[in-house]
Amino acid sequence: MVDVNRFKSMQITLASPSKVRSWSYGEVKKPETINYRTLKPEREGLFDEVIFGPTKDWECACGKYKRIRYRGIVCDRCGVEVTRTKVRRERMGHIELKAPVSHIWYFKGIPSRMGLTLDMSPRALEEVIYFAAYVVIDPKDTPLEHKSIMTEREYRERLREYGYGSFVAKMGAEAIQDLLKQVDLEKEIAELKEELKTATGQKRVKAIRRLDVLDAFYKSGNKPEWMILNILPVIPPDLRPMLQLDGGRFASSDLNDLYRRVINRNNRLARLLELNAPGIIVQNEKRMLQEAVDALIDNGRRGRPITGPGSRPLKSLSHMLKGKQGRFRQNLLGKRVDFSGRSVIAVGPTLKMYQCGVPREMAIELFKPFVMREIVARDIVQNVKAAKRLVERGDERIWDILEEVIKEHPVLLNRAPTLHRLGIQAFEPVLIDGKALRLHPLVCEAYNADFDGDQMAIHVPLSEEAQAEARILMLAAEHILNPKDGKPVVTPSQDMVLGNYYLTMEEAGREGEGMVFKDRDEAVMAYRNGYVHLHSRVGIATDSLNKPWTEEQRHKVLLTTVGKILFNDIMPEGLPYLQEPNNANLTEGVPAKYFLPLGGAIKEAISNLELNPPFKKKNLGNIIAEIFKRFRTTETSALLDRMKNLGYHHSTLAGLTVGIADIPVVDDKAEIIEESHKRVEQITKQFRRGMITDDERYNAVTAEWRAAREKLEKRLIANQDPKNPIVMMMDSGARGNISNFSQLAGMRGLMAAPNGRIMELPILSNFREGLSVLEMFFSTHGARKGMTDTALKTADSGYLTRRLVDVAQDVIIREDDCGTDRGLLIRSIAEGKEMIESLEERLNGRYTKKTVKHPETGAVIIGPNELITEDKAREIVNAGVEEVTIRSVFTCNTRHGVCRHCYGINLATGDAVEVGEAVGTIAAQSIGEPGTQLTMRTFHTGGVASNTDITQGLPRVQEIFEARNPKGEAVITEVKGQVTAIEEDASTRTKKVFVKGETGEGEYVVPFTARMRVEVGGQVARGAALTEGSIQPKRLLAVRDVLSVETYLLGEVQKVYRSQGVEIGDKHIEVMVRQMIRKVRVMDPGDTDLLMGTLMDINDFTDANKDVLIAGGVPATGRPVLMGITKASLETNSFLSAASFQETTRVLTDAAIRGKKDHLLGLKENVIIGKIIPAGTGMARYRNLEPHAVNEEEYLNPPVEEEGNEETTEVVVDTAVETVEETVE
């Protein structure tokens, strides 16, 4: 076998007959499989040991030679080679076909490759191949046309007319084979190139397609006649096994049935030919042989599929590769692994952030080999067998050994569905009793896990390298930030939030108010002994608290609460004291009003202060983000654990409970509803009198009930008691929101009907009062719709993620700086008055392209090619700069990836991205993972003024990434200039917009009901939208440049996600959009050897042009093509990646004809062949490093060179570096 990590590329071509013979170990002549009595394979049958190898290791069929010492000997009695059984998985056989047979992939595929090669229609081909018509192979001197088709009857008539032997016409695959042999590729290609110079329309399209196929044959060295099979390979028997079932019956792979049909028909045909049977019988047998081979290769592609028992279609070779259950997706891209287990998860509140609880019986099973090795090493038993017995008996001594073995041996926990990389994290195992895995409560958000019966899988990394990577790169404590937006993904939730909220509350007039303490311990002691309440405002000496005080703040008394003293106790030392829950306090320190000179009038000072709100979930998130920014991961994860413990402790002490009496009652609810009823009556009256339309009435009624619900909501909020447990849960962000609260205490409001339209009858009751039967019935509609929507959304979102991953999986950070001279000019993204994404957010973590200066003073804020930090971004925006040119993925020149400077920081770590980071996959996950949060629906804009549906949510994202024509498309102008007139034409119900510019005039017809974005006298740019709606990106590409289209797509995706409150970094969307515009269509080949009309990678196109320009020729011209992500994935340079994505047979057919070479640059290709992926630590530049020991002395005191040798030293160092670079490449 070839070592997978050795080879550089993989090529696929058509197999010539000689190639098939060279693979084969012998001919399969009989359809028999296994002898039913002896259960031994039959000779010359489909499982023959002589051809395929022995069924038992190191043993021939007759048993003359047994044991390994006879390896390689071929038995003189039975002819079987003594070797491993494993060869039955790799040795192939063959069947010599008695008549040539066409390969269905090349004849039936779309477009038909055989048809294009011969310039015949697939219909005509089918008639010839299946013996329904003759084709003229050589007309000789007759007036018949070469390749013309004739029926049996016509053939007889022509024979009578011109005489026997006056021309050659044949039927069947044999005829096609003769025609294919006659094709002169060079001559045909030259003729087609000539034809293309003048051809137009349909002729031109056909010529381009033919040229493409013929050129593929010519360049790859494949011969067209190899599309016809004279010899059929038989795959190894262990890949189509026969298994004996309990009842003595056999279960066999469908392929055996299909092969059996071929062999039977082939043998019958041979016998008929020997007997010189009548032509019609032979013809029929040949047709049946052709059909049998078709079914074997791709059953059901032509006509009705061959079925097995129970009329189930048999699975052919093509089906073995296709689809989710095919070879690619089932066995190559994802495999089941050893050393893994799964169990239900339970919460582990006492664990540290980097730990997980593993049940003892699970751990002993997972770490069995490690424990056994240790048992033998300690001489408890003598050999491994005995050690295994010891473990299986559950001996007492194994538990201590297990404890030691798992120490510092991380395990991976994974929860399905793994939507992003945080779905697999590493933990240090802690042995526990019970049978459930214990999970740290803070990592639940990343996994999207809860403890209502979720299960998780556990995996053990075995090798030292795998353990090191798990520990350094995947440890849960390292994953503080979410890769999609760089915000903390581990924020306290539920009880933890509630505890910290309760802890930091302030109340006026509670016991012990105004007491002053010398330090924290005294305050805690007073609290424990009941002298002071947790929420009482007290004083504490600032000097006793280890915080970064200013000079004025020292030697003072700080006014705070006991709870806040405890809360600040867990914070890192360098952080300011947190007194107010806002960012100013977090970054600049406590405001001056909370400080009092020693011995000042404290009670008076306290009474002058307003009560502060407690710390809510959002504030805790900001604190964590700030701490991460200042102290990085280790300190942050330690703080998170302290915050978790504090939160759980105090939510327990607070003892918050919920009773029905905690739901407040709004006194004037009846009046509010009565008022609305009256208004609705008035609206209905107006409608009855014909003053308003039905649509207007509907909108007015629903608006009225919405207003009523909002009024109730406002009353509720105004009257709420801050110490009400439900209000505390809601306000802190622990659970529930204002809408839930208003359904409990206000009114449920309007509901959606099953068709998605909002019903006019609102639900007036709330849950405290209880719903009437009719109201209950109405509310079930909404609930049901919610459930179905979620189910559909999950599937759609998952498929979107799969397509995104596929198109971007080969985008890896490949170099430090690509040295591009272009940049991207960015400003904030806004929709009308609404800000979608601010400039500050867009700048953070990117590199500048040009110097940014202060618009007023002209002072340099930041130079070119410098990283814009959060603070720099704020400084740029505060200076009043509105647009900045940055380095962007769009303008990066790196081949097969991106460079570090164009990408910026890695959002998951907050540091500059490393070479080797698989940014394409991360981008795909970041866009796909929040997909389930997006809505499914297409909104009707409501009201009368529009007749267009605006697509939003998930369908809109799919529309953008698939580059489809959008629903509700906007009309765009191709002229830059001024709108001179807008004319309405009532007869055709359209409007005409006239635009006059320097380059010419444009006249655009828009629907009568479309809402205009321009008015007469307004200026418009090229590609600007004249009406409301979405622009079709392909049209925009025709009038503007690539960068404008990329920028438009980026903005559109951001609008969808941000409108749903999902934040995604620009760079992720940039990576995806760049993959959609990677191809160029050749318009004129110039002096290059490119073909007109072909799609090619933009890099290959520029390379071809470079070579021609250097030689002084005319370069080719091309037009950039925008493709949807599905098409872009299938057009990738890697055929393995494309075939494992979709349309497997089409991709492989095409790749084989072209003799495509897969250079294994992406991740999928390498996973498929089992090679280590070329990203992260698997990248060549990291794999080829040779570690060597350094003498400590030299390391600490490097030897000083003498002055004379300086130059030579430098040169030596340079060449050394260069050679290293070369080997790394």
From Swiss-Prot:
Mind listing the GO molecular function terms for this protein? DNA binding; DNA-directed RNA polymerase activity; magnesium ion binding; zinc ion binding
Keywords in UniProt for this one?
DNA-directed RNA polymerase, Magnesium, Metal-binding, Nucleotidyltransferase, Transcription, Transferase, Zinc
InterPro entries given in the database record: DNA-dir_RpoC_beta_prime, DNA-dir_RpoC_beta_prime_bact, RNA_pol_asu, RNA_pol_N, RNA_pol_Rpb1_1, RNA_pol_Rpb1_3, RNA_pol_Rpb1_3_sf, RNA_pol_Rpb1_4
Name the Pfam families on file.
RNA_pol_Rpb1_1 (PF04997), RNA_pol_Rpb1_2 (PF00623), RNA_pol_Rpb1_3 (PF04983), RNA_pol_Rpb1_4 (PF05000), RNA_pol_Rpb1_5 (PF04998)
Q: Could you list the residue ranges that cross the membrane? A: none
- What EC identifiers does the entry list? 2.7.7.6
The entry's cellular-component GO terms read: DNA-directed RNA polymerase complex
Q: What HAMAP family has UniProt attached to this entry?
A: RNApol_bact_RpoC
State the family it belongs to: Belongs to the RNA polymerase beta' chain family.
Descriptive protein name: DNA-directed RNA polymerase subunit beta'
Natural source organism: Streptococcus pneumoniae serotype 2 (strain D39 / NCTC 7466)
Q: Which gene encodes it?
A: rpoC
